[in-house]
Amino acid sequence: MTSKPMTRRPTANNHRNRSPETAKKLGQLHPRNPHQGRYDFVALTHALPELAKHTITNPKGEPTINFSDSAAVRVLNQALLAHYYGVKFWDIPEGYLCPPIPGRADYIHYIADLLAQTTHVNKDNTPPTGKEIHALDIGTGASAIYPIVGSQSYGWRFTASDIDPISVNTAALICETNPKLKSAVKVKLQPEPKRIFANIIGRQDYFDVVVCNPPFHASLEEAMEANSRKQHNLQRHRGKNENEQISRSSTKSGNAAQNLNFGGQHKELWSEGGEIAFLTKMAKESQDFAEHVGWFTTLVSKSENVKPMQLLLKQLGVAQMRIIEMSQGQKSTRILAWRFNTDEE
């Protein structure tokens, strides 16, 4: 994506011929990410006719939706999943995160590059595909977005975990209801909220990669302040490329203000100590499962947390560590990846 609105969707050759490095410099999605440019409302409405009821016209005369309307955002996600990933049923409860799919997909495609460069499954360094690749999604949420994108883009198997029973039941229902997902994704409840890998990774398990989108706020108040800023930005940038918008489902329960298009249970949005505390716990616990995982990876939303995590991982004796930058319009984020074994071992 560019920071300016695009008037047409780029062709496959326009973006697939770019390198990931070029995409980052241009603020664009990964070249293999199908969610390039503006949303194709003709194709999306064909995949899910219900989207037409939520489609409006922006000041430029282009079709879009009201991203402050949680119902419209949910239907847009349903259309995207139906059109690009063949998912016929997808729904989440009120008040749970309705993730922006283009950005979530970028994580998976950059992870595919990491595996291509380090697993040596394919001699030409193309991303490995098929069920031989087993991925673990920590904190999958009710949406199960990473398992959906990863399994349908590359054919990988996924185990998806969460500490919230409603999220686990919802994600399991989505996977059980869609034949394409039923044999590809297994959803597990983490019975101990303070543990990450224990109870999920068994003695005989091996995962090629772990993915994680951790809660990054330290309190509900901090999360609500961030949401208010995002809502303000939604109003300021209305009419820009929709893929830069933050998709959130509204909440009607809990302690959050009901007039905010908030989205997300407390377990999804914040944890004690915030992002750095969660990442620290994840890194320390990863030591105990070094022989069971190829690459541990996680998103790091706050750039100031990168250096402390690098220092900690060095202290823990990791063999390899990588920072993978991602850029989506004017938003930048990164993946922190580490492992305890080298390519040769």
From Swiss-Prot:
Pfam families for the chain: Methyltransf_10
KW DNA repair (keyword) present: no
Positions of region (Disordered): 1-35, 225-258
UniProt similarity note: Belongs to the methyltransferase superfamily. METTL16/RlmF family.
InterPro entries: DNA_methylase_N6_adenine_CS, METTL16/RlmF, rRNA_lsu_MeTfrase_F, SAM-dependent_MTases_sf
Record field: compositional bias (Basic residues): 229-239
Alphabetized UniProt keyword annotations: Cytoplasm, Methyltransferase, rRNA processing, S-adenosyl-L-methionine, Transferase
Protein name, per record: Ribosomal RNA large subunit methyltransferase F
Gene designation per UniProt: rlmF
One Gene Ontology cellular component annotation held by this UniProt entry: cytoplasm
Taxonomy, superkingdom: Bacteria
